[in-house]
């Protein structure tokens, strides 16, 4: 009888240890995967910051910022450093943050066809809630002018001088408390230089 009780206690102990180990492993696995996803998204956002910072006039003479909405931004920038200015289209589609690009026509005058030529994934597992856009835009009065900043969207492209990028990343829906926010402010260098020259 004592042997049966000892075996039962031992079995319960093993089952408890196995359950504890399993839960710990699942928790660590989730943390590790979320960390990987956040790191990859952070690298993608850093690239976007560089492209936006170096926005410039399109090869067809277009203003550096083509359109500026909550989850959609179109600028001109030489993203692949080949001396040719591409039209870059940053937008959210489902849980992905994407960049579409389009090179200008080879002949003269230069033109940009409609639509994106190709698309690159900037970040995955994006979980921004409704009412939390990816892009916020600020005019030249920021940070002193907090009443008119961030500017209303879709923004008047002539007003945009500073862009805030905010994405929230999570590998599991329904765990909003674990969302990892990644935020960065970027000044459009060519436009701020223009403000200094014009003043």
Residue ranges: model-predicted function:
Residues 1-54, 197:
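Aliphatic-rich helix starts adjacent to a transmembrane/signal segment
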Residues 27, 58-59, 175, 196:
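Generic macromolecular interface patches on structured domains
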Residues 33, 81, 127-199:
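Short linear sequence signals and composition-biased patches located at protein termini or domain-edge surfaces
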Residues 43-67, 82:
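Alpha-helix exit/C-cap motif
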Residues 64, 87-89, 185:
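Short, surface-exposed charged micro-motifs
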Residues 67-68, 160:
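A generic fold-level signal
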Residues 68-148:
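Type IV pilin-like appendage domain
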């Amino acid at each position: 009888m004592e042997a049966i009780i000892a075996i039962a206690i031992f079995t319960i102990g093993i089952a408890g240890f196995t359950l504890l180990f399993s839960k710990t492993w699942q928790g660590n696995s989730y943390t590790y995967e979320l960390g990987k996803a956040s790191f990859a998204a952070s690298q993608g956002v850093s690239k976007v910051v560089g492209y936006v910072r170096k926005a410039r006039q399109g090869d067809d003479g277009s203003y550096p910022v083509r359109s500026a909405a909550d989850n959609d931004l179109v600028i001109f920038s030489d993203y692949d450093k080949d001396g040719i200015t591409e039209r870059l289209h940053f937008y959210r589609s489902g849980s992905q943050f994407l960049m579409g690009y389009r090179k200008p026509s080879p002949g003269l005058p230069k033109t940009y066809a409609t639509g994106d030529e190709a698309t690159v994934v900037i970040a995955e597992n994006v979980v921004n809630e409704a009412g939390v856009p990816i892009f916020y835009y600020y005019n030249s009065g920021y940070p002193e002018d907090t009443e008119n900043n961030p500017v209303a969207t879709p923004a008047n492209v002539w007003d945009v001088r500073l862009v805030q990028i905010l994405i929230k990343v999570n590998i599991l829906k329904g765990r909003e408390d674990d969302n990892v926010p990644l935020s960065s402010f970027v000044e459009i260098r060519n436009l701020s230089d223009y403000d200094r020259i014009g003043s």
